[in-house]
Structure formats: structure tokens, C-alpha cells
């Protein structure tokens, strides 16, 4: 795993740039007790670096870091990293939002879709301990129409702009219908257009969104539906952007592979994967490259590294 320390420095600088007023001068969130030498920003940057290298196993990550002891003199233990990664998940999400606003602040057309996030095979669902003591956050059985299969886990809902930047997302039980996500975000957006698939088809929800926040929900008609109209081709083409994002997250960030034993750990991993995707898009943005070409974005990043 070459250049891990160099890539870490680049990502750390980006996180530091977008964390103003969120952390102190040492890169830590305000809290009581001993000030950690390995700062909260460094924990976030290390997690994002691992995700961008395709390393989603903490055990494998710390085995790789054995070669970089001189570059990380204050590196914490694996157990401390696991705990602090969960602790800093909200800070990581706030930094991601700041980056997304810098890339795509004036967007008024968004694509909405959902993606299954299985936590184990169907046969092992009853033995899965994820969420065993918290039913509200526990996984459930669901059905994916696109893949024509049942699964046990969660459902990732995402709202992205036409350029492919994720502005909002949420994780729900697999059994929750896609359309309920729109009720959660209708107060966050105003006077814009949402492009969805047939899973978001509902006249009552369309009317409610428009009356509440002047949001137009554009979905394709079913063939046997009353007052059928053909799909507007530019909308159909634009909506595929969110599907491309999900494909990239499954391929490069291994969204559907789960090592977490608790819900908070799984949620922290999802936040890291989406934040890593957003940072790669930001690197392409400042290099005037297509935002969707994230595979080799870090190789083209020539910004001077200040981390040491």
C-alpha cells in the first residue's frame, strides 16, 4: 500500500480546510478530560484514507500502518480508533456537508433513490446480533425490486444533485418504503424538483410536497395508469446519476460488505464511505475534472501537503 501517508496528508488538509469553527486549533472537538495527541481530524482523515484505498477492515488497516510508524508518531491503538471513529462520525458528516456545499451550492434539481445495504445472508438473519437490544435501529427484512431479491439489513436513501454530489441521505430499516424518506427531508428543501423512480409514485405525496415546500416530485407513469404521459427524456437520463453513485459506492467503497457488530459502527462506516466519495469529487472539482471520475482522483491532486 504505497503512499498511504502522502494521501493521508492531502485528505487531512481538505478536512482541516472545511472544519473551521467545528474544532479547536489542535483539531479536536471541545470536550473535558485529557487532550488527545492524535486529533479528531486525524482520526477522520485516517478513516477516509482507508476507504479511498478500499481498506474497510480495521485489522488490515493497522497491519498496513506498521510500515508507517515514523509518519504517525502519535497513532492510537486499534480499539481507541474504533471508539473515536464512532465518536467523530457527526463531525465527519458536518465536514462532508461543507464540502458538498462548496461544490454544488446552487442546485435546484435533485435525484432521489434508495440502495439495499444487507448486513448478513437471509439464512443467518435470526442469529444476527446487530441491533439486538435496540429494535428502533435494528435491521429488518426487505425486498429489492431492481435485483428481484429479498435481503436482511437496511436501506440507504440518498438525494444528489445533477452533478452527482450527495446533499442528503439517511439509513432506514429495509422494510421502510422509499416514499417515507421524502417526508423527512421536505422541510430542508424549498422551491426545487425531485426526480424519482416509480417507487415514489404517489399523488398525495406529490401534492403534500408542493403545498409544504413548493417541491415538484417528477416520477415516471405506470403504463396502465390513468392520464398516462410519456417520460420526459432529460429527466430519465438525469436520474441515472444517483444510480451511478450507488454503483461506485458498491464497487470502490464496498458498501454492501459489513464488518460492524453494532448499529453505531455500521452508521459510522456509511458516513465514512459517503464522505470519502465527496472528497474525491471535491478533488476533481478543484482540478476541473469530471466529478464522476473518482477512481484515480487522488493521483491528480497536486496540492502542497502541510500535515506533519
Predicted stretch roles:
Residues 1-308:
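Short alpha-helical elements
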Amino acid at each position: 500500500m504505497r503512499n498511504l501517508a502522502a494521501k493521508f496528508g492531502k485528505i487531512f488538509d481538505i478536512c482541516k480546510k472545511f472544519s473551521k469553527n467545528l474544532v479547536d486549533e489542535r483539531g479536536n472537538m471541545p470536550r473535558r478530560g485529557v487532550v488527545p495527541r492524535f486529533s479528531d481530524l486525524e482520526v477522520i482523515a485516517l478513516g477516509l484514507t482507508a476507504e479511498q484505498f478500499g481498506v474497510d477492515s480495521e485489522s488490515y488497516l493497522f497491519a498496513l500502518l506498521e510500515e508507517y510508524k515514523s509518519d504517525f508518531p502519535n497513532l492510537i491503538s486499534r480499539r481507541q480508533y474504533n471508539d473515536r471513529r464512532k465518536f467523530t462520525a457527526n463531525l465527519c458528516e458536518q465536514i462532508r456537508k461543507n464540502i458538498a456545499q462548496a461544490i454544488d451550492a446552487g442546485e435546484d434539481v435533485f435525484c432521489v433513490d434508495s440502495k439495499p445495504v444487507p448486513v448478513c445472508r437471509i439464512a443467518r438473519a435470526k442469529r444476527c446480533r446487530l441491533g439486538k437490544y435496540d429494535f428502533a435501529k435494528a435491521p429488518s427484512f426487505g425486498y429489492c425490486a431492481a435485483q428481484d431479491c429479498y435481503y436482511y439489513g437496511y436501506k440507504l436513501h440518498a438525494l444528489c444533485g445533477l452533478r452527482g454530489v450527495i446533499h442528503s441521505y439517511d439509513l432506514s430499516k429495509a422494510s421502510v418504503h422509499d416514499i417515507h424518506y421524502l417526508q423527512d427531508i421536505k422541510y430542508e428543501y424549498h422551491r426545487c424538483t425531485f426526480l424519482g423512480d416509480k417507487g415514489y409514485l404517489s399523488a398525495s405525496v406529490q401534492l403534500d410536497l408542493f403545498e409544504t415546500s413548493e417541491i415538484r416530485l417528477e416520477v415516471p407513469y405506470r403504463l396502465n395508469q390513468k392520464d398516462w404521459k410519456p417520460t420526459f427524456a432529460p429527466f430519465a437520463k438525469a436520474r441515472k446519476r444517483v444510480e451511478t453513485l450507488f454503483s461506485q459506492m458498491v464497487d470502490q467503497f464496498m458498501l454492501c460488505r459489513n464488518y460492524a457488530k453494532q448499529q453505531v459502527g455500521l452508521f459510522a462506516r456509511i458516513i465514512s464511505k459517503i464522505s470519502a466519495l465527496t472528497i474525491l469529487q471535491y478533488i476533481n472539482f478543484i482540478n476541473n475534472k469530471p466529478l464522476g471520475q473518482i477512481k484515480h482522483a487522488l493521483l491528480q491532486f497536486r496540492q502542497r501537503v502541510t500535515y506533519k
